[in-house]
A protein has these predicted regions:
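Terminal leader/tail segments of proteins
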Residues: 1-126
Length: 126
């Protein structure tokens, strides 16, 4: 497995130009537990530098949408998502979800957002 760092946008463009779909897996850093996996396309989109996964592609058994929120002046208010491992260990803010979005950002509504690359508590693999 390869950890992607640097210009994921450039790498995604090159891979897609060759006709091979790019698959992205997001993992919790400490345990390497998978949090989400999908191929770029209808189930996975890159938006403003972050990955947004369709809810069907995330590991709902280890992800908990919280009441904690953040309000982006452009996109609207999102809820933070925590990782809860099988041992009960909780890692805060591994992802976020916008239940409703401001006009112009509908593509991310209801999707789970993760930072691209390796940042904070998650890491990206392809």
């Amino acid at each position: 497995m390869t950890l992607i760092s640097g210009s994921i946008r450039e790498r995604s463009r090159i891979v897609q130009e060759k006709g091979t779909p790019i698959s992205v897996t997001i993992r919790e850093k400490e345990s390497s537990a998978p949090l989400a996996q999908a191929d770029v396309g209808p189930s996975l989109t890159r938006y403003e530098g972050n990955w947004y996964f369709d809810p069907a592609t995330v590991k709902a058994d280890v992800l908990r949408v919280t009441e904690r929120t953040y309000t982006c002046p452009q996109k609207g208010t999102c809820n933070w998502v925590d990782y809860v491992g099988p041992d009960g260990r909780t890692v805060k803010d591994v992802a976020w979800v916008y239940p409703q979005v401001n006009p112009g950002h509908e593509v991310i509504q209801g999707r789970y957002g993760f930072y691209a690359g390796s940042k904070g508590t998650t890491k990206e693999e392809n």
